[in-house]
Design a protein with these regions (language model features):
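Short alpha-helical "packing" element that flanks the helix-turn-helix/winged-helix DNA-binding module
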Residues: 196-203, 242
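Recognition helix of helix-turn-helix DNA-binding domains
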Residues: 208-241
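Short, hydrophobic-rich beta-strand element in sensory/regulatory alpha-beta domains
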Residues: 32-37, 42-60
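Short, basic, alpha-helical segments at the C-terminal edge of helix-turn-helix-like DNA-binding modules
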Residues: 239-249
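Juxtadomain coupling helices with adjacent low-complexity linkers
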Residues: 1-16, 25, 144-193, 201
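Regulatory sensory and allosteric helical modules in signal-transduction proteins
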Residues: 65-115, 121-124
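Signal-transducing coiled-coil linker helices
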Residues: 17-31
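Short hydrophobic beta-strand micro-motif common in sensory/regulatory domains
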Residues: 130-137
């Protein structure tokens, strides 16, 4: 029998103050997964965060410049023709509008492209048709990513009732989680060496390379080498982009 959402399940568990104060990205992820699974019957999370200004272009470009993590089923991910954002109407709607979007909203169907309709068929095949996407924002209220919450065993009407009544609480929990998770997780992805992070920190403060080299007791050539390595590790085409990512992902 499907376990139904209960409104009372959301009363206390969505308090952002309950999020652990930890720098361990895996521990934080497991906490969110267990909390939503135990109390809300959410099974499967997708997380995406990217620096503001990087949102233009195709989803393939965006996801390459972002950090993301998911607990969606492996067979579902392998069946996708592209990455998780490819032809995902709900996810792209959230990233464009900043509005909560239900995966199974019937009003969305007429607006979908052929590829997006094919994605819906794939979702149904892998029992991924019920869920919702939530946006995350910068302090200036610009969209910088979001979460997908997949409910495997939920009745759509019950799930919609919970989203309608508690989307604000869920949104606050996810937003606060992002603030605590983004830095620790980004560090596991970019793996900057201490000197590379230090160089980016000086650049973020507006310091020129020559002065930076003097400050660190290094040659300009060595500093340039650190900058090049930092660009590569952060998948940045320029040093300015690497600095922007370092600031956004709390690496400096």
């Amino acid at each position: 029998m499907n376990r139904m959402f209960r409104v009372e399940d959301f009363a206390g568990i969505l308090d952002p103050r309950l999020i652990p104060g930890s720098e361990d990205a895996d521990f934080l992820w497991d906490w969110l997964s267990k909390t939503l699974y135990d109390h809300c019957d959410v099974e499967g999370i997708f997380y995406l965060a990217y620096p503001v200004g990087e949102s233009g272009g195709k989803p393939e470009v965006l996801i390459e410049r972002a950090i993301w993590r998911t607990s969606y089923p492996e067979d579902y991910l392998n069946a996708m023709p592209g990455n998780p954002l490819t032809n995902d109407y709900s996810a792209n709607h959230v990233l464009e509008t900043g509005e909560v979007s239900r995966w199974h909203d019937p009003e969305s169907l007429p607006k979908m492209t052929k590829g997006e309709r094919a994605r819906i068929e794939l979702d149904e095949k892998y029992n991924m048709s019920i869920g919702a996407c939530f946006p995350i924002f910068t302090s200036s209220r610009r969209i910088c990513g979001g979460f997908g919450l997949r409910s495997k065993s939920q009745d759509a009407l019950t799930f919609d009732r919970v989203i309608q009544q508690h989307h604000a609480e869920i949104g606050r929990l996810l937003s606060t989680f992002d603030e605590k998770f983004r830095g620790p997780y980004a560090r596991t992805q970019f793996k900057l060496a201490p000197q590379e992070a230090r160089v980016l920190a000086y650049l973020a403060g507006g310091m020129a390379v020559q002065r930076l080299a003097h400050e660190m007791g290094l040659s300009p050539k060595t500093v340039e080498a650190y900058m090049s390595s930092a660009r590569k590790k952060t998948s940045s085409s320029t040093s300015a982009e690497a600095v922007a990512k370092a600031i956004f992902f709390n690496l400096v």
